[in-house]
């Protein structure tokens, strides 16, 4: 009997030790990364990678990259950057849009692709968290089978929980001004996340997150508004004829997204429209449409990141949890996801009422989410214009156009820009720098430097 009792106690202790170990493993999984394969020498910035568990049992493990501000991390803003998709990895933002590293554009020869420093990183004046979300994106994963698939509203809650836990482990940043940013499909999740954080600050969560505002680039906002803007945009950019445009307006009555199936004349005109535009690279209409494996194509850089991230030495350096090891994809469109926010306009309205400042910017050569639609929903908020439409300048050259509204919202175009910040990274960096510092976009700035 005594032996049975001793055996029971011993097994219980082993189980307790095992549970404590598991708890520690999932509570503290952050790692400082000093160097990365493909980059010469130590990293010239402070990088941390890790997992934060969310959900009742912390079954969802969200992977993040955190880079401290290169200026004054104790006081500079903290920015959470969400890549669109849904299902596009945070690496897209980090290596192509606004991070301190990018791929060296050499033709792949079977060896590990190289990384080089950028001169346009937003981390020059803010700390940044690049987050792999929703679950299944990048290196984020679930330790158990999920009964509820990710959704727009569900992600807003998960991201809020992630932030609370992340700041709990990084309390030195809890008083820094906090912003949420992203582009493309993040136009749905970012406004909802801002509202969720704002509600949490008032209702449930202490200490409050020092939320100040948000920014979005070429944001998907309302499928009807965004979709209906593509035809007038195509006409304005001389992609379709005046005759076709006038016929579309008259026969389809401005409704191009949800066409009456009995309106055969409209459907026929839309077929003609698609014939004119189907061979365009929609993310930037001036770029050629070609295969990702073509070294002469813009999107070849995405192939390089695929080779780099899927290298075993890179995953080891990033401290990737073995449970999440699988083939990394820049964007995985196959994951189940519920799009339960039809329009994020009401979220913008609520965030405006609550006083949060915002920056909405549009690359003016994006055919995916044309700037025309973005201007339509901004106008629907019905706020007075504070600063009239005017050019914003870099080195005495027009970099785009901008105006501001009474709800602390700034709208800006990026001249020659595309669907994401990556097409004009120098210009978007200057734009972000001015806005985050509370300056007017049309102010003065230092000379631009070129990417190394």
UniProtKB/Swiss-Prot annotation:
Residues 1-29 form the signal peptide. Expressed in seedlings and roots. It holds the Pfam family Peptidase_S10. The keyword Membrane does not apply. Disulfide bonds join 88-331, 252-266, 290-297. GO terms for cellular component: extracellular region. It is found in: Secreted. Its EC number is 3.4.16.-. GO terms for molecular function: serine-type carboxypeptidase activity. Glycans are attached at residues 109, 125, 350. GO terms for biological process: proteolysis. The active site is at 184, 366, 419. Its main location: secreted. Gene3D superfamilies: alpha/beta hydrolase. Keywords: Carboxypeptidase, Disulfide bond, Glycoprotein, Hydrolase, Protease, Secreted, Signal. Belongs to the peptidase S10 family. PANTHER family: SERINE CARBOXYPEPTIDASE-LIKE 1-RELATED, SERINE PROTEASE FAMILY S10 SERINE CARBOXYPEPTIDASE. Probable carboxypeptidase. This is Serine carboxypeptidase-like 6. It comes from Arabidopsis thaliana. The gene is SCPL6.
């Amino acid at each position: 009997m005594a032996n049975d009792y001793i055996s029971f106690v011993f097994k219980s202790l082993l189980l307790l030790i095992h549970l404590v170990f598991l708890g520690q493993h999932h509570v503290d999984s952050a790692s400082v990364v000093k160097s990365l394969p493909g980059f010469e020498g130590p990293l010239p910035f402070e990088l941390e990678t890790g997992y934060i568990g969310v959900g009742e049992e912390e079954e969802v493990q969200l992977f993040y990259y955190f880079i401290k501000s290169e200026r004054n991390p104790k006081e500079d803003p903290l920015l959470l950057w969400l890549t669109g998709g849904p299902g596009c990895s945070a690496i897209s933002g980090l290596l192509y849009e606004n991070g301190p590293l990018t791929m060296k554009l050499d033709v792949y020869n079977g060896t590990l692709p190289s990384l080089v420093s950028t001169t346009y990183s937003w981390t020059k004046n803010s700390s940044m968290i690049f987050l792999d979300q929703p679950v299944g994106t990048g290196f984020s994963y679930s330790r158990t089978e999920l009964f509820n698939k990710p959704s727009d509203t569900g992600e807003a809650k998960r991201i809020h929980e992630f932030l609370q836990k992340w700041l709990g482990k990084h309390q030195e940043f809890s008083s820094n001004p906090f912003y949420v940013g992203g582009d493309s499909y993040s136009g749905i999740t970012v406004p909802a996340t801002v509202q969720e954080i704002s509600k949490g600050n008032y209702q449930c969560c202490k200490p409050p997150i020092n939320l100040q505002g948000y920014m979005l680039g070429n944001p998907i906002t309302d499928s009807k508004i965004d979709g209906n803007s593509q035809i007038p945009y195509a006409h304005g950019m001389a992609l379709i004829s005046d005759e076709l445009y006038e016929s579309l307006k008259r026969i389809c009555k401005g409704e191009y997204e949800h066409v009456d199936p009995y309106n055969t004349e409209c459907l026929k005109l839309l077929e003609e429209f698609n014939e004119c535009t189907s061979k365009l690279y929609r993310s930037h209409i001036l770029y050629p449409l070609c295969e990702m494996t073509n070294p002469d194509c813009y999107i070849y850089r995405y192939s390089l990141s695929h080779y780099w991230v899927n290298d075993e030495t890179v995953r080891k350096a990033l401290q990737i949890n073995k449970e999440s090891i699988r083939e990394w994809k820049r964007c995985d469109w196959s994951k189940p996801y519920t799009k339960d926010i039809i329009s994020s306009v009401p979220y913008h309205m609520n965030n405006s009422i609550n006083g949060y400042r915002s920056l909405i910017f549009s690359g003016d050569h994006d055919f995916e989410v044309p700037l025309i639609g973005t201007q339509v929903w901004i106008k629907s908020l019905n706020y007075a214009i504070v600063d009239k439409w005017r050019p914003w300048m870099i080195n005495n050259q027009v970099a785009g156009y901008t105006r501001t509204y009474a709800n602390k919202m700034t709208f800006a175009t990026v001249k020659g820009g595309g669907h994401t910040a990556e097409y004009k990274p120098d210009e978007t960096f200057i734009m972000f720098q001015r806005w985050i510092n509370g300056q007017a976009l049309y102010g003065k700035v230092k000379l631009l430097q070129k990417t190394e």
